[in-house]
Amino acid sequence: MNCWKTINLMKDYGAVRIILTAVCFMILVFISTFLAFELLRPGTSLSDEYVSLFGGLLVVILFVHKVIHVLPIICKKRKIEKKFYILRMRTWKRIPKTTMLISLVSPFLLITPVLFYAALAFPNHAHYFCMISGIHAGYCLPDFLLALKLIKAPKTAFIDQEADGLDILVEK
């Protein structure tokens, strides 16, 4: 296996740019989801109860995000390294490109619709679900940036996570 390319988001974009883009993306997603909710349920009165539940749900969503990342890899029955750090897991060893792409975008595609449905189901607390959805979307931004870079890789490539980023491996 040869290394086709190494992806390091901090080196490519910089931490400040990623954070600023993530915050802008959070605000954009919050505004768009809240406006969509208001179009579907106009005139709903919002309640400011259960703020602590909002904080707890936010923490749970971030951990569920990490678990959903691992599910496509488990479905492929790949050997994964089980080092669970707080919100940081090093699990990627020789993962096929398509599996890695699915793993990167699946948290956003699974969690965001659930949060929007929860906003419709509990209209008095919709602003909480829209905020969590926005925060989660900002948390997904590095995954989207990695996915955009992986799309350009050869179809038969494998992904290996190293300490400084991801390596895209191709066979000779």
From Swiss-Prot:
Cellular component per GO?
A: plasma membrane
- Indicate where this protein is primarily found: membrane
**Membrane topology value:** Multi-pass membrane protein
Query: What are the protein's UniProt keywords?
Result: Cell membrane, Membrane, Transmembrane, Transmembrane helix
Annotated disulfide bonds: none
InterPro entries xref list: DUF3267
**Any Pfam family hit:** DUF3267
**Localization in the cell:** Cell membrane
Q: Say which domain of life the source belongs to.
A: Bacteria
Q: Where are the transmembrane segments?
A: 18-38, 54-74, 102-122, 128-148
Descriptive protein name: Uncharacterized membrane protein YhaJ
What species is this protein from? Bacillus subtilis (strain 168)
Q: Which gene encodes it?
A: yhaJ
